[in-house]
Amino acid sequence: YNEILPALKVRGSVEGKKVAIIGGGPAGLAAATFLSRAGVAVTVFERKEQLGGVVRNVIPEFRISADSIDKDVELCKAYGAEFKLGAEVTSVKALKAEGYTDVIVSIGAWKPGRSPLAYGEVTDALEFLMEAKKNGATMNIGKDVVVLGGGNTAMDVARAAKRIPGVEHVRLIYRRTKRYM
């Protein structure tokens, strides 16, 4: 990686194009990498202070390390993409007025699911993972945790919950058999 990164070269030159990318998550970084590699002037606007989106802020460290995410960001920077962190964009029209010829909106499609459970404490999986990643050692979620689902996110929630001090039992409830998990 360290030998290859300095050798990366822009593969072309695209005149008259200046692209703004709203969102520095996986889609925004991918778009920035491919466009800047092709010689397009690219600026990524990220409202948070770090790039990576859900991958950095939600997916647990035991699945992908911060170092791996940082390397992806460095790859994007190696091709010349510019990044503006802590920059929330509220108007595509304003970006166009600043001279951007094209705008890519890659803000993610996060819409928390809501459980139909009438009683008890229910937390959205992505909200839980984000909180566990930031404050897992100090969270108080009780000693018994039930996770609804059997996919990758449910497994991440179960594994993250098991690592929280005070949690004794984590149970998965899934509507199908183990074969379909």
Task: Give a label for each model feature.
Residues 15-45, 84-94, 103, 110-113, ...:
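Rossmann-like dinucleotide/flavin-binding elements
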Residues 48:
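Conserved SAM/SAH-binding beta-strand->alpha-helix loop
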Residues 38-39, 61, 120-122, 164:
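Glycine-rich, phosphate-binding/catalytic loops in enzymes
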Residues 51-100:
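N-terminal Rossmann-like dinucleotide/flavin-binding domain of flavoprotein oxidoreductases
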Residues 1-18, 66, 105-123, 137:
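Ferredoxin-type iron-sulfur electron-transfer modules and their immediate structural context
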Residues 77, 116-118, 166:
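Short, structurally constrained coil/turn elements
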